[in-house]
Protein backbone atom coordinates (compact mmCIF):
# COMPACT_ATOMS: atom_id res chain seq x y z
CA UNK A 1 0.00 0.00 0.00
CA UNK A 2 1.28 3.47 -0.68
CA UNK A 3 2.28 5.36 2.43
CA UNK A 4 2.98 2.28 4.51
CA UNK A 5 6.48 1.51 5.58
CA UNK A 6 7.93 -1.84 4.73
CA UNK A 7 7.90 -4.25 7.62
CA UNK A 8 11.29 -5.16 8.98
CA UNK A 9 11.98 -8.83 9.19
CA UNK A 10 11.62 -10.05 12.73
CA UNK A 11 14.63 -11.70 14.21
CA UNK A 12 13.86 -15.08 15.70
CA UNK A 13 14.04 -15.20 19.47
CA UNK A 14 15.87 -17.87 21.38
CA UNK A 15 14.24 -21.25 21.00
CA UNK A 16 12.35 -22.40 24.04
CA UNK A 17 11.86 -25.87 25.34
CA UNK A 18 8.47 -27.45 24.58
CA UNK A 19 7.84 -27.82 28.30
CA UNK A 20 8.18 -24.06 28.78
CA UNK A 21 5.71 -23.44 25.98
CA UNK A 22 3.24 -25.90 27.48
CA UNK A 23 3.48 -24.24 30.88
CA UNK A 24 3.01 -20.77 29.41
CA UNK A 25 0.06 -21.95 27.33
CA UNK A 26 -1.55 -23.59 30.37
CA UNK A 27 -1.12 -20.41 32.40
CA UNK A 28 -2.69 -18.30 29.66
CA UNK A 29 -5.62 -20.70 29.29
CA UNK A 30 -6.14 -20.70 33.05
CA UNK A 31 -6.23 -16.89 33.15
CA UNK A 32 -8.68 -16.83 30.25
CA UNK A 33 -10.90 -19.41 31.94
CA UNK A 34 -10.80 -17.53 35.23
CA UNK A 35 -11.94 -14.34 33.49
CA UNK A 36 -14.82 -16.13 31.79
CA UNK A 37 -15.82 -17.79 35.06
CA UNK A 38 -15.80 -14.44 36.88
CA UNK A 39 -17.92 -12.82 34.18
CA UNK A 40 -20.44 -15.65 34.31
CA UNK A 41 -20.68 -15.46 38.11
CA UNK A 42 -21.14 -11.69 37.91
CA UNK A 43 -23.88 -12.02 35.30
CA UNK A 44 -25.64 -14.65 37.41
CA UNK A 45 -25.50 -12.40 40.47
CA UNK A 46 -26.85 -9.41 38.55
CA UNK A 47 -29.65 -11.47 37.03
CA UNK A 48 -30.65 -12.70 40.50
CA UNK A 49 -30.65 -9.16 41.87
CA UNK A 50 -32.69 -7.66 39.04
CA UNK A 51 -35.03 -10.58 38.39
CA UNK A 52 -38.55 -9.45 39.21
CA UNK A 53 -40.78 -11.39 41.54
CA UNK A 54 -39.03 -14.74 41.87
UniProtKB/Swiss-Prot annotation:
Q: Mind telling me which GO cellular component terms the entry cites?
A: Bcl-2 family protein complex; cytosol; mitochondrion; nucleus
Which processes are annotated in GO (biological process)? cellular response to glucose starvation; cellular response to hypoxia; defense response to virus; DNA damage response; intrinsic apoptotic signaling pathway by p53 class mediator; positive regulation of DNA damage response, signal transduction by p53 class mediator; positive regulation of extrinsic apoptotic signaling pathway via death domain receptors; positive regulation of glucose metabolic process
Q: Does the keyword Mitochondrion apply?
A: yes
State where the protein is found: Mitochondrion
Instruction: Give me the ranges of the annotated region Required for mitochondrial location.
Output: 41-50
Is the keyword Mitochondrion in the record? yes
Domain free text: The BH3 motif is essential for pro-apoptotic activity.
Binding partners and assembly: Interacts with MCL1. Interacts with BCL2A1. Interacts with BAX. Interacts with BCL2L10.
Name of protein? Phorbol-12-myristate-13-acetate-induced protein 1
Please give the organism.
Canis lupus familiaris (Dog)
Amino acid sequence: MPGRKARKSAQPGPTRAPEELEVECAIQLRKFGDKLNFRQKLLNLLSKLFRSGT
